[in-house]
Amino acid sequence: MKKNKGITLVALIITIVVMLILVAVSINILVNSNLIGHAEKTGDAYAGAIKNEENLGNDGITINGQKYATIDDYINHNPMSTIKINMEVTHEDTAVTADGTNIKSIEHGVPIPVGYSYVTGEKNTGVVIQDDTTSDQFVWVPVLQNQKIKIEITAEEEITEIKIEDPLGTLITKNSENNDITVSGKTNTSIINPTTNGEYTVTVKTASDEASKTLYVKSLYAQDITSMRDMYLAVIKKQAKEQNITEDEAAKAITGGQCNTVEELITTIKQMMQQYTDSDIATHEGSVNKYGGFYIARYEAGSENQRTSSSGTGNAVLSQANKYPYNYINQTDSITKAATMNNGKTNVTASLINSAVWDRTLNWLEETNAVTRAELFDSTSWGNYRNSKFNFIGKYSTDDGDNFTETTASTQKSENKCYLLGTGVTDYTKKNNIYDLAGNCWEWTTESPSSSTRVNRGGHYNHTAFDTPAYTRADDSADSSYYNISFRSALYVSL
């Protein structure tokens, strides 16, 4: 008999009835819960957002009553803050004119002091001047005049708190007019006086939101706190990569276990920098702000005669090319000798460089693209270090300054060779017309971390450029005198 492969009529009717019941239940659920309506609204909003995404601005897009910066932020449930913070450095230039007493002329926007002559260079690449009597040379480092930080805040709710921190984490509670920074309403505009280079952070709170913004200030005649942090972070990243360890493990290693994490190290650096004082900065702030900059010696301090540990301070100090390094001098005597570099003039003041001069000069090199930020923390490409390689013509020593040779033909300083060079004998070390800021000799400054120690900067020829880059600091007792420490002078136009 042929077997029936279909279903009975009764079974078919039962199946249809069950399906109708299920459809009715599903429709009832959708209607009662308004899922269709929600889906339509979301779909419409999303479609509209996609259509308008190419027109996104600072206001973002609104989906279902909330603002998002991008479609991705909407997908990831990351709405925009209801608080907006804008921070910027402002400045107000004042005219500098040639008065015939302090200033002889203005060349390329730079004041040339009486008793000096313009040699070469532009304002953004290094204007060089020369003493009409001694032939010592100096380079102008520009600084914006009357700098302030302007902070503008807008919120959709009443602002309940504004916290402003300087690069050391110190709270700023006064504005530039020394009035309290008050909190009121949904907007706030404050203007503050920046005190040091580094990161300034503003945190704003309302009843339902909180936002922060950071501004890195590099343009001041002041210490740079944040660059010290960034230099250590560069060391940590390099060590972590080379040793295949975490950055926290690298932070612990380079601090000898004193810091267990990178965050702890950053906090420690801030605390450390609070101990670094430099009273010489305030002495010259008026001149720097009035004239819009300062002069730094083009060369490390030089001497006509080769120096030894018993040389004393009788040699005249020079800022000229191809002189013997003025080494074997302690910090105290460096202050005295640096002050003589105005050659008795009263329209300019000479002084041992301070931390503001050093940090501002390096930041200026970065601003003008003479060096990259990475090259400030690994200065192999522009400094005389053990691991650098370049050609030079002039004086050099291969035995830590005991004996010098002078070459008149281009000579190669090979990698992993240690040469103490005469001043400015290779353009390899020249940036914006300034020589040897990176390597060759450590350079004394007026900065101090304690009552008995003083800071020298820039590294030296026996070290690698990553261990002691241009931004590095080292501490020595003020009476230390070594073959690898020299100094440099700065010039300030008199008020």
Q: What do these predicted ranges mean?
A:
Residues 5-27:
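N-terminal single-pass transmembrane signal-anchor helix
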Residues 29-53:
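Aliphatic-rich helix starts adjacent to a transmembrane/signal segment
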Residues 78-150, 237, 241, 246-248, ...:
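GGW-centered surface loops in extracellular recognition modules
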Residues 123, 133-135, 225-436:
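Short aromatic-cysteine micro-motif
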Residues 192-198:
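Surface-exposed, short loops/turns at beta-strand junctions within beta-sandwich domains
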Residues 204-206:
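Conserved structural position at the C-terminal beta-strand
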Residues 211-219:
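Edge beta-strands of extracellular beta-sandwich domains
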Residues 328-342, 348-349, 353, 428-429, ...:
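Disulfide-stabilized, aromatic/cysteine-rich ligand-recognition loop
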